[in-house]
Amino acid sequence: MEGGGRRVFSNYDLQQVTSSSTTIQENMNFLVPFEETNVLTFFSSSSSSSLSSPSFPIHNSSSTTTTHAPLGFSNNLQGGGPLGSKVVNDDQENFGGGTNNDAHSNSWWRSNSGSGDMKNKVKIRRKLREPRFCFQTKSDVDVLDDGYKWRKYGQKVVKNSLHPRSYYRCTHNNCRVKKRVERLSEDCRMVITTYEGRHNHIPSDDSTSPDHDCLSSF
């Protein structure tokens, strides 16, 4: 009903508006405590563990109790979960790899030690050479008659000398005696004869050289 530019509401309309507002308020009163309860539950759990990670409610189907499980790796580490087992497996793998590396290093060391032993044996053989005897004689002939038969097997040029160095080996069976003949660089008339080893046989009987007795005495 309208009059003088004003709108007049009937009692029915006011009652309907009041009832609708009451219904909205009741609905809000019903919803607000539910939301406040959830918010309070969240903050209470987070405030109780200030140093740990945030937690969320976990509902059990068999009971109405609510438990809060923190998010993170603490459960796995404490309970021996998959992370803890992985750490143990990694340690075991590292230990196994170390064992394989040790075996490989031991085999490498043994091979090197074996080669080192061979080198040492060669050095010992070189040190255990036959004794040497050196004679210096004034002669026009390079090869002196010493009562043994020799075969020339090598020759080498000597530095600062006009005469080469000759190498001879005894022709007797199973005799390993060698000799080296060269002339002195300061005096070409002097012949230097160096013997290596000892003869295991007697000299020849057809030797007529005057130096036979001297050279065959060794």
UniProtKB/Swiss-Prot annotation:
UniProt keywords, alphabetically: DNA-binding, Nucleus, Transcription, Transcription regulation
InterPro entries: WRKY_dom, WRKY_dom_sf, WRKY_plant
Pfam families registered for this protein in UniProt: WRKY
Top-level division of the source organism's lineage: Eukaryota
SMART domains, alphabetized: WRKY
Region annotated Disordered, chain positions: 49-120, 199-218
Biological processes annotated in GO: plant-type cell wall biogenesis
Regions of compositional bias (Low complexity) in chain numbering: 49-63, 105-116
UniProt keyword Transcription present: yes
DNA-binding residues: 139-204
Localization in the cell: Nucleus
Gene Ontology molecular function terms on file: DNA-binding transcription factor activity; sequence-specific DNA binding
GO CC, one annotated term: nucleus
UniProt biased composition (Polar residues): 64-77
Chief site of localization: nucleus
PANTHER family listed in its UniProt record: WRKY TRANSCRIPTION FACTOR 12-RELATED (PTHR31221:SF137), WRKY TRANSCRIPTION FACTOR PROTEIN 1-RELATED (PTHR31221)
Its job: Transcription factor. Interacts specifically with the W box (5'-(T)TGAC[CT]-3'), a frequently occurring elicitor-responsive cis-acting element.
Family from the record: Belongs to the WRKY group II-c family.
This protein's name: Probable WRKY transcription factor 12
